[in-house]
Amino acid sequence: MTKDDESLDLVKQAIREAGLRATPARIATLQLLRESPSPLTHAAVAEHLSGLGVDKATAFRNLNDMTDAGLLRRTEVGDHVWRFET
């Protein structure tokens, strides 16, 4: 098993342990935010995932679901834009 396979398995496991289905969009979202050196906005996440066929509404819903499940943190620094991080 390669390091990438192990990382993917850990992401899937974390999503499932949080009580969510490990869909391709959620897996890609969590991987993106784990690899990001800084918090990302919904727009940035949606832009990164658009190449995978994930629309903005799905990206936003997944960010909220994963925040509610404790996988992500949501912050707002006074500019009325939420940023997400692991």
Question: Regions from the language model: what does each represent?
Answer:
Residues 68-86:
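Non-DNA-binding regulatory cores of transcription-related proteins
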Residues 27-32:
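Pre-recognition alpha-helix immediately N-terminal to the DNA-recognition helix
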Residues 33, 59-69:
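Basic amphipathic alpha-helical segments that dock to polyanions
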Residues 5-19:
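Short, Lys/Arg-enriched N-terminal segment that forms or immediately precedes the first helix
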Residues 20, 34-37:
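Short helix-capping/hinge SLiMs at alpha-helix to coil transitions
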Residues 39-48:
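Short acidic, hydrophobic short linear motifs in intrinsically disordered regions
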Residues 8, 25-26:
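Short, leucine-enriched amphipathic alpha-helices that occur as contiguous helical runs
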